[in-house]
A protein has these predicted regions:
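Binuclear metal-ion centers of metallo-dependent hydrolases, dominated by the metallo-beta-lactamase
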Residues: 1-4, 75-87, 138-141, 161, ...
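Core dinuclear metal-dependent hydrolase active-site scaffold
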Residues: 1-31, 80-140, 155, 203-205
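Redox-cofactor binding/interface segments in oxidoreductases and associated redox assembly factors
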Residues: 21, 37-38, 95-99, 147, ...
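Active-site metal-binding motif and surrounding structural segment of the metallo-beta-lactamase
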Residues: 24-70, 141-146
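Active-site environment of divalent metal-dependent phosphoester hydrolases
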Residues: 27-28, 42-46, 68-71, 85-88, ...
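Portal/gating segments that form or line small-molecule/metal binding sites
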Residues: 49-102, 114-116, 188
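Charged helix-capping and loop-helix junction motifs
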Residues: 108-112, 155-162, 186-189
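Metallo-beta-lactamase
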Residues: 117-170, 174-182
Length: 205
């Protein structure tokens, strides 16, 4: 298994399949995506240029309902999802987790944005999307958590660390910092706040 974080929240997990999440600023024409998961409709999470650079004829896109009108202009191979549901598509089974701000206006709960929990090679991954620490997120059990730390639009670094220490995954991977909001070195503060029993890997440096 190989994990890559390109920038912001753009993630690629490679096993026997290539699984992307929120592709953004991907300039190379890979055309290798088997699945693409989109968390919400902001430009740094739904980037059509990046999508076109990774899509192939059989790619399946998984997207919140708010993006259906845009996605269907790119491909017919997509499904729409709602928060707090379970789905299966192809070889993958996954759950959607509500992704929203508690007291900020950027990601209202009523927009029905999502994070994703899915099982890959006997490990449970949680890709949170742009969210604060919510009741729904606190219920998630996972092995690997991609957690936003940049603040402003999401939880800040201390909130993110407290959250990770609470749910205690085996591995935490900080995202959503270093390009739009959050200093590139923010991951260092995050690492210092994490329980030593939890491994941290920072791909954005």
């Amino acid at each position: 298994m190989q994990i890559e974080v390109f920038t912001q929240s753009a993630i690629k997990i490679t096993t026997t399949k290539n699984i992307y999440f929120d592709p953004y600023q991907i300039k190379n024409k890979y055309h290798d995506a088997d699945y693409v998961f989109i968390t919400h409709d902001h430009y740094d999470h739904y980037d059509e240029e990046s999508l076109r650079n990774i899509l192939k004829e059989t790619t399946i896109i998984i997207t919140p309902e708010c993006l259906e009108d845009r996605v269907k202009n790119i491909t017919k191979n997509y499904i729409t999802v709602l928060p707090e549901k379970s789905y299966s598509v192809g070889e993958l089974s996954f759950e959607t987790i509500s992704s929203y701000n508690n007291d900020k206006p950027f990601h209202p709960k009523e927009k029905l944005y999502v994070g994703y929990k899915l099982k890959i090679e006997d490990k449970y991954f949680y890709i949170m999307g742009d969210t604060d620490v919510t009741n729904e997120a606190l219920k998630v059990k996972c092995d690997i958590c991609f957690v936003p730390i940049g603040g402003t639009y999401t939880m800040n670094v201390k909130e993110a660390a407290d959250y990770i220490n609470t749910i205690s995954p085996k591995l935490a991977i900080p995202i959503h910092y270093g390009s739009i909001v959050g200093d590139i070195n923010l991951y260092k503060e995050f690492i210092e706040l994490i329980n030593p029993s939890i491994k941290v890997e920072a791909y954005i440096k």
